[in-house]
C-alpha cells in the first residue's frame, strides 16, 4: 500500500494535522506510514503463528504451494485467516450481548416492558448456551433450510466458537469446511446483534428518529465534556447520562451507539480520527470500552492531561450505579483542574436525523417502487474507517453515485457517522443530487426524510430487521430483491463477521480493503461460487488497491442492474 497523500476529507480533522506535526504528536496516519511496506504474506493471508514451530509462510506463485511445518497449504492458511477474523468479530458481538444481559439482570434499572425483557433474556441465554434455534423462527423457512443443509445453524458458544477455534489448532479440515465454519460462527454474531437490538427496545423503549449534531464543533467550551469511546454496556451508559444530566456535564460519543432512549450521545468524530478530539483540549474525561478504541488514546491523553477510565479492567467497580456517579464527578474535577489548557474547538457541525427503524418506514412502498423500476435497488452502507484510504472519501463518493442512480441507501453504525458529517443525514439537505425515482420515493415515505436512512448502531441489528421486514412486505426472501451491502472502508473483525452474515442472508457484499485471502485463488473462488451455490449471494473481495471509488460504485451499480450479468437478485426482477 502506498502513502496516503490526503489523510482526510473532514475539514474539522484536517486543521489538527499540521498542529500535530508542529507539536511532534504521532497520529494514526504517521504510525501507518511507519509500518510501510506491509508484509505481503500477512496481507494475502499466507502467514501463520498458530503454533510454536513457526512462524510459517506460503506463497501465491503459480502452481507452487509451499507448506507450513505442519503441512498447511496456502488454501488452508487463507481460509483459516478469515475464520480467525470472524471468530474475533463474533466474540465481540457476544461479549456486548453478555454485558448487556448482566446489566439488565442486576435489577438496577426500570424496565419499559418487563414481560418482553424476560422473554428476550431467556432467548439471549439460549443463544449463548445452545445456539439460535428459537431465533431462527423469525427468518424465512427457505433461508433456514439452506443454513441447515450447509451445516451452519448455530449451536451456541461451545458448539460453534470452541469448535471453530480448534480448526486453527489442527485437524485435516479443507479450506471449504473452514469457510463454512466461518459462516456458522458469523450467524451467532448476526443473531446476537438482533437480540441486543430487541432487548434494548424492551428495556429502554423504542428508538425514534432523533435530530442531533455531529462533528467536533459539538464540544463545549464552558462545560465539562465527558466522551464515551467504543462499545459500552447500555445500562452503564444510561446511568452515566442520568448522573451527568444532574451535574450539568456534557456527554458525547466516539464509536459508540448514539441512541439510548431518552438520551442521545452526539457523535464527535468517527473511527480513524478518534485521537483528534483530545487535540482540541476540550475533552475532560474519557470512558473507554475495548472494541473500536485504540491504545494510542492513553498516550495522547497524558499529553493533554485527560483522565481515561477503562470499564474492562479485571478489578474494576462492579456496582454500575456507583461507577457512573464516580465517572461524572471525576469529569467535573478534571474540568476544574484543566482550566488553564486552551480549548481549540472548530466551529464545524452538521445536523443529522438518525435512528430510523422498520416501524418508521412503509416498506410496501419500497417494494412497489422496486417492482415498477422506479428505483434500481437498495444499498446497505456499512463499515467504519480505514487509514489505508482518505478518511470518508470512499464511502461518501460511492454514496453520491448510488443516490444519483436511483438506489435507495440505508446505513448503520460508523458508516452513518461518516455520512452524517457531509449532510447525507440532514433532511434540509435532501436536495442533494438524487435520481428522480429515489427522490419521489423518499417524499412518499415521509416528510423531511434525509437522502440516506440511518438504521442505528450495527450492534443493534437494525439492518437485519430491515431485511426481514422487507421480505415480509412481499412474502419473498431478501435475496429475491436487488440488494447489496458495501463495506467501503472496513477495519475491524466485527465488520468481517457482519459481512459474512450479510452473505449468509443472501445479500451480495462488497468488501474493501481486500480481505487477507487473496493468496489463495481457491478461497477467493469459493467466496464467489461456493457462496452463490449455498446462499444465492457472493462475497466480492477486490484486490486492486488503486481502484477509484467512482469505479467501485459503477461496478456495483452494473451488478445491481444486471449490466455485467444476472442481477444480484439472481434473476430478472419482476
Residue ranges with predicted function:
Residues 2-574:
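Anaerobic metallocofactor- and corrinoid-dependent redox/one-carbon enzyme cores
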Amino acid at each position: 500500500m502506498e502513502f496516503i497523500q490526503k489523510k482526510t476529507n473532514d475539514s474539522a480533522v484536517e486543521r489538527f494535522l499540521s498542529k500535530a506535526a508542529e507539536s511532534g504528536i504521532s497520529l494514526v496516519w504517521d504510525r501507518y506510514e511507519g509500518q510501510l511496506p506491509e508484509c505481503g504474506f500477512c496481507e494475502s493471508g499466507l502467514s501463520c503463528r498458530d503454533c510454536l514451530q513457526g512462524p510459517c509462510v506460503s506463497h501465491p506463485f503459480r502452481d507452487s504451494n509451499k507448506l507450513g511445518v505442519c503441512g498447511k497449504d496456502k488454501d488452508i492458511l487463507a481460509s483459516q485467516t478469515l475464520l480467525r477474523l470472524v471468530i474475533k468479530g463474533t466474540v465481540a458481538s457476544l461479549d456486548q450481548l453478555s454485558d448487556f444481559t448482566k446489566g439488565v439482570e442486576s435489577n438496577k434499572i426500570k424496565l419499559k416492558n418487563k414481560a418482553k425483557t424476560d422473554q428476550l433474556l431467556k432467548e439471549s441465554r439460549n443463544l449463548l448456551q445452545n445456539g439460535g434455534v428459537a431465533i431462527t423462527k423469525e427468518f424465512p423457512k427457505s433461508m433456514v433450510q439452506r443454513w441447515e443443509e450447509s451445516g451452519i445453524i448455530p449451536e451456541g458458544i461451545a458448539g460453534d466458537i470452541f469448535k471453530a477455534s480448534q480448526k486453527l489448532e489442527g485437524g485435516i479440515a479443507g479450506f471449504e469446511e473452514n469457510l463454512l465454519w466461518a459462516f456458522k460462527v458469523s450467524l451467532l454474531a448476526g443473531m446476537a446483534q438482533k437480540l441486543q437490538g430487541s432487548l434494548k427496545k424492551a428495556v429502554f423503549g423504542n428508538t425514534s428518529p432523533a435530530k442531533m449534531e455531529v462533528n467536533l464543533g459539538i464540544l463545549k467550551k464552558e462545560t465539562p465534556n465527558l466522551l464515551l469511546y467504543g462499545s459500552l454496556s447500555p445500562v452503564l451508559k444510561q446511568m452515566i447520562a442520568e448522573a451527568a444530566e444532574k451535574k450539568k456535564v456534557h456527554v458525547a460519543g466516539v464509536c459508540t451507539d448514539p441512541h439510548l432512549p431518552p438520551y442521545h450521545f452526539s457523535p464527535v468524530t468517527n473511527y480513524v480520527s478518534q485521537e483528534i478530539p483530545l487535540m482540541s483540549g476540550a475533552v475532560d474525561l474519557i470512558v473507554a470500552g475495548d472494541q473500536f478504541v485504540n491504545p494510542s488514546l492513553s498516550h495522547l491523553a497524558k499529553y493533554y492531561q485527560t483522565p481515561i477510565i477503562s470499564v474492562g479492567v479485571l478489578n474494576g467497580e462492579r456496582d454500575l450505579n456507583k461507577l457512573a456517579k464516580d465517572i461524572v464527578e471525576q469529569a467535573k474535577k478534571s474540568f476544574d483542574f484543566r482550566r488553564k489548557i486552551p480549548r481549540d474547538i472548530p466551529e464545524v457541525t452538521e445536523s443529522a436525523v438518525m435512528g430510523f427503524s422498520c416501524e418508521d418506514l412503509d416498506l410496501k412502498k419500497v417494494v412497489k417502487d422496486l417492482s415498477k423500476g422506479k428505483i434500481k435497488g437498495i444499498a446497505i452502507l456499512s463499515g467504519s474507517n480505514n487509514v489505508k484510504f482518505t478518511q470518508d472519501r470512499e464511502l461518501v463518493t460511492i454514496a453520491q453515485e448510488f443516490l444519483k442512480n436511483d438506489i435507495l441507501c440505508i446505513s448503520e453504525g460508523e458508516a452513518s457517522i461518516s455520512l452524517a458529517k457531509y449532510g447525507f443525514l440532514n433532511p434540509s439537505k435532501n436536495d442533494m443530487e438524487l435520481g428522480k425515482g429515489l427522490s419521489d420515493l423518499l417524499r412518499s415515505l415521509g416528510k423531511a426524510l434525509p437522502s440516506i436512512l440511518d438504521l442505528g448502531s450495527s450492534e443493534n441489528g437494525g439492518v437485519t430487521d430491515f431485511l426481514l421486514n422487507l421480505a415480509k412486505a412481499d412474502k419473498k426472501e431478501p435475496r429475491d430483491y436487488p440488494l447489496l451491502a458495501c463495506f467501503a472502508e472496513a477495519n475491524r473483525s466485527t465488520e468481517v463477521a457482519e459481512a459474512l452474515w450479510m452473505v449468509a442472508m443472501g445479500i451480495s457484499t462488497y468488501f474493501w480493503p481486500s480481505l487477507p485471502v487473496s493468496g489463495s485463488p481457491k478461497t477467493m473462488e469459493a467466496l464467489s461460487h461456493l457462496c452463490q451455490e449455498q446462499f444465492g449471494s457472493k462475497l466480492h473481495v477486490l484486490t486492486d488497491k488503486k481502484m477509484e471509488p467512482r469505479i467501485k460504485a459503477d461496478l456495483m451499480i452494473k451488478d445491481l442492474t444486471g449490466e455485467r450479468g444476472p442481477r444480484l437478485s439472481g434473476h430478472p426482477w419482476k
